[in-house]
Amino acid sequence: MTALRAENLHFAYQDKVVLDGVSFSLPRGKLIGIVGPNSSGKSTLLKLLARQLPLQRGTVEIHGKPLLGYSLKALARELAFLPQRPMLAEGIRVEQLVQYGRHPHQGWFNQWSAEDARQVARAREVMQLDAIWQRSAGSLSGGQAQRAWLGMILAQNTDLILLDEPTSALDIGHQAEVMEAVHQIAAAGRTVLIVIHDLGVAARYCDELIALADGRVQAIGPARQVMTKALVDRLYDTDVDILPAPGDGAPVIVPRRRTRALQQPTLREHPETEGMQ
């Protein structure tokens, strides 16, 4: 069953073409990564799918229904979107942030239901938020903040989740923490589409990859089949080695040095040092 289908998407900012004929479909219950160099259209693509930008050309269907056939509130019950830099209300606690994920499911008077409470409690447990539940969201570390935002997304209880670089600016420990949480969400049956820069992390955690460059899909398929040396070299205009990681064999991408290391001079090569002991 297909969760989302995009056909022939085009988008331009004035005269700069950002997406040029992008087509793909997302299977349900998979973690799909979007990779590619800077300015390849990754974030723009997510914004189009989330109706943060208007469709200029092409079509998008969610669960077989045209994207524009949904009201914004109805769309928010089907699709959750976490941008790169989400806005945070001053002083909001983690508990309140997660509860906000239930807003699309509430009526005019925002009545709180037993289902709302159940989904919030589940998000709190899955994202392991007990220790920070009453803290100000603005006081959290990078990894804690991303887990709190993911808690809000999980409480929203949509089948389709779009994440724009949730691991950017995080150290390796917090990257792993966030990606384990994202993988857990997908393993529970959600379809997750994530923009990610770290190719090794993408290859290890994602079921499938969509490679973008110059606004076009360059490759799509199972992550470990897509992540080839030829593709990475071409996408990033570089030269890499791809090695299997110990244990699970996940691809480890290592860029080759473009120049030889400079030979370090010895003391004898400096006349002024001769005779010095």
Regions found by a protein language model. Give the residues of each.
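Conserved ABC ATPase signature
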Residues: 111, 136-140
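ABC ATPase nucleotide-binding domains
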Residues: 235-277
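Conserved structural motif at the start of ABC-family nucleotide-binding domains
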Residues: 4, 18-21
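Catalytic Walker B motif of ABC-type/P-loop ATPase nucleotide-binding domains
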Residues: 161-165
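Conserved ABC transporter NBD signature motif
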Residues: 58-66, 75
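The feature captures the beta-strand-to-loop junction immediately N-terminal to the Walker
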Residues: 35-37
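Helix-to-loop junction immediately C-terminal to a conserved catalytic motif
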Residues: 50
